[in-house]
Every structure is written in C-alpha cells, then in structure tokens.
Amino acid sequence: MGTIVVTGSASGMGAASAERLRAAGHRVIGVDLRSAEVVADLGGAEGRQTAVDEILELSGGVLDGVAAVAGVGPNMRDAAAVASINYFGPVALLNGLRGALERSDAPRAVVISSNSASTVPMIDETLVELMLGGDEDAAREHAAAAQSALPPRLIEASPSISAYATSKLALAHWVRRTAVTPEWGRKGILLNAIAPGAVLTPLMTGSTGADKDFDPDSFPTPMPLGIFGEPEDIGFWVEQFLRPEARFTTGAVLYVDGGTDAAMRPTAQPTALRR
C-alpha cells in the first residue's frame, strides 16, 4: 500500500476520502487547519511551504498519491482569499510535491474542482487568465475589485460566487494543461480532477442552506436523480483515480453531480475539434 496526502482531511469530502484510503490500507498524511498530521493554512505562501516541508519529512520524500480536496465555498466573504485557497493553494502544493510523486512506481494526483465551473454563469475570464498565469497578487486584487462591483443583494446571498466558480474552472483548466506536460505525463504522474455537484458537506450547507432534510427538487440547479450526494460518493472516486490500476487516465475532469451538468449542458461534452 502507498503513502497518500489528503488536504482538507478534517471534514467533508476530505475526511471521507482519507477514511476510504486508510480502510484500503494506505498511509494517509492529512493536511488541514486542525486535527491533521500536517496543520497548515494553504491560503498563503508560508503555509503552503510549511505543508510541503512537513509532508516531505513525514513521507521520506516519496509519495504515491496526492488528493487536493481542501477548499472554501461561495459564502466566504473574502473573494481574494477564495482565489488563493481554491486555486493557488492546490497548485502550489502539487508543484511542491511533484518530485516526491516522481519517486513512486505509480504516482497519482487528483484535485477537487466543482460543477459550478460550468453551471454558474458568472465566470470571470480575466481572473481565469491571472490564475493560470500564476500571478496571485494580481488575481487577489482583481477578485476583490470584481466582488465590490456586484449587486449588494448578490453579495449578501453569496458573496464570492464568481470567484468560487472561476477558481474551480481555472483549477480544472490547470489540471488538463499540466497533466499532458512532459514533467507530469512522461514521468508517469497521472493528474485528474473531480467536479462534484450538490454534496451534503458543511461547505454546501453553509453556502446554500441545504441539508439532509432539504428537498432536492427545490435546489437552484437541476437534480435529475432526486438526491444529494454524500462525501463518500466523492471519496469513492478519489480512491479510484489514485489506484495504480488507473494507468491510462490523465487530464480528465469527472462530473460527480447526480447529472446536474448533463441536464444543464447536454451537448457540451464532447466538444468537436474545429477545422
């Protein structure tokens, strides 16, 4: 069995992923703000470096997998922090741990995006470019300015919805771009993303008010299966992507959303290559 890092391991999808991986016999190095093997704040450069350093020490410099699950939701009032935590945090961590992954016989990495990247019509293309360009200071400044320009009623209801959806889209694009580079693909480090939908976690309840007693048919987006997801539904796919047998899948974005994206964008995938 392998050594696998799981960020956001103290609650929600991260906790479910860590539990499933431990049950499968893996050694899990959890990363979170509390109750984890590595306690670090991935929202800033210092915390990210602390996390990388401690993970490398605990793992002996060899990792078989990384599951970047940690993130914050659209109800967070600081849009700049959302950009840092949801995009720059996982990207910096994965880049910092790439060398340790390369030393494994079957290295795997998976990150958590969101179906909000394709179902929320508030993507900030400028912010996407700044994120993919790696300019965190400019991205934070832009996210804060864009948030202040939103209608007050929207800021009150979901203060960082645009920054949230945009950060998750940029993260999915980073995965697809990065997975096929020689530094990842030709080194055998497989990198994929999961795009969850309405999953009953503290993050979703805090963002939407939906809990286990909430009627799925009253949710703002379509719920074709008539149920909400559970953290364990995401943990299942995290484990699948990290398995050594998953040897021919990289650069994928898997929607685990009960059919929401398919209901809203039935012809969006696959997209034909234009001549």
Regions found by a protein language model. Give the residues of each.
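Hydrophobic structural elements of the Rossmann-like NAD(P)H-binding subdomain
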Residues: 67, 110-112, 191-194, 204, ...
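Rossmann-fold cofactor-recognition segment
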Residues: 33-50, 55, 71-72
